[in-house]
C-alpha cells in the first residue's frame, strides 16, 4: 500500500506523484554527476537496476556511502516521504557489476512509513537496509542543546590533497578541507573532520547526506597514526532537519566531524555529524567497522563495505 500524498511530505522538498511514489524533479539542465551515478533504472514493482561507476570504487568495490545513497533513494522513491533514519547492514562486498535494488513499504501510517531495502548482485544480498520516513508536521515540540564543533573557517582550511595513487577513487568526488581534529596518520586526536562538498556544487538531499556520512577518511587513522583496511559492518544515519537546509546553497560546504573512542579485537565505532555553516546539525551517523592489517601502500580499501562471506 502506498501512503497518501500530504502537505507535510511536500514541505520537505520532495515532489510526490499522485500514487504516492516519489517523482524525480524535472530535469531543466545537465544532470549532476552524483545524480547520474546514483540513478535507479525502474525494473517494475518496487525494483530498480543500478550501477557503480569506477569513480565510486574503494579497491574492488563501491564505497559504503555510495551504497547508502542508493538505499536512501530507493526508500524515498517507494514511500513518497522524506528520509529520517536509515540503518544498513553490509553483508557482502559487491563488485562493480550491475546491482539490483528493491524496496518494500512494510507499513505506511498517517505520518510515517517503514521501508525495507535490499541491494543484490547476481541474486546474492549485498546490503540490507531499513528506513524510517516522515514529513515534519508543524507543532512538534522542539529543543536544541547541540553545539557546533570548533573548526577553522573554510577560507583558512587546507584542501585535502588527493593526488596519491592509492587514494580511494570515490574521494575525488568531493572537495574536502581539513578544519578540525587530526589529519589521517597523525596520531594526534581521536577525531577528524572539516568542510565537505561535492566537487561540482549540488544541493543537499537524503542520498547525498547518506553518502557524506561515509566520505571522510576514517577517524581511526587520526587516532592511531596508522593506515589499514577499514571496511564497514553497519551504518546508521539520522537526518535531523529538512533537506536542503533553509539558507544553504549548493555552493556551501557542510562541516563534518567524525570521532572514535574504542577498538576491541579490531572492531571499532565511528560517530559522525554533519553541520550547516551556520551551526545547525543536519545529520548524525554511527558505524561499526573493522580494523584489519593488510600489506598495502595506502588507505586504498578504507570506507568500503565489509566483505562478509566473499573470499578475499
Model regions: which residues?
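Terminal targeting signals and extreme-terminal segments of soluble enzymes
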Residues: 2-4, 10-312
